[in-house]
Amino acid sequence: MWREDNENTATLPPAFRTSRDRFKTDPNLPTRKGLDTLNISGSSQPSAEQLAQIANTLRTKTDGPIYVVDLRQETHLFVNGIPVSHYGKRNWGNVGKSYQTIINEERDYANKIGKYGPSYRFFRCE
């Protein structure tokens, strides 16, 4: 089953945050000491336009390189800029599959979807 994760809008995605942002602290939890210099951010799955907004926002905070690290395990693609995910029961769509099987399936999905318009995928980092 496929799910649309977000709309392709020129805004920051929901839950966008950086380690420099202010947030509530709980005195019973460890401190955030050192995190404000770590220069990391996170968000929900961005659309293609939202990814551009993230890059623009982060560019105001650093002159160095910006790396996208994709930690999602389920297969996900951009279709006309809209992020979509393939998932199964309990979000276990890829459970039990080899890495190569998943990569081959993702390539097949992208090729099939690409016949109907532009599609893009995030490349999994290892």
Cite the ranges covered by each PLM segment.
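Cys-dependent protein tyrosine phosphatase-like superfamily
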Residues: 1-126
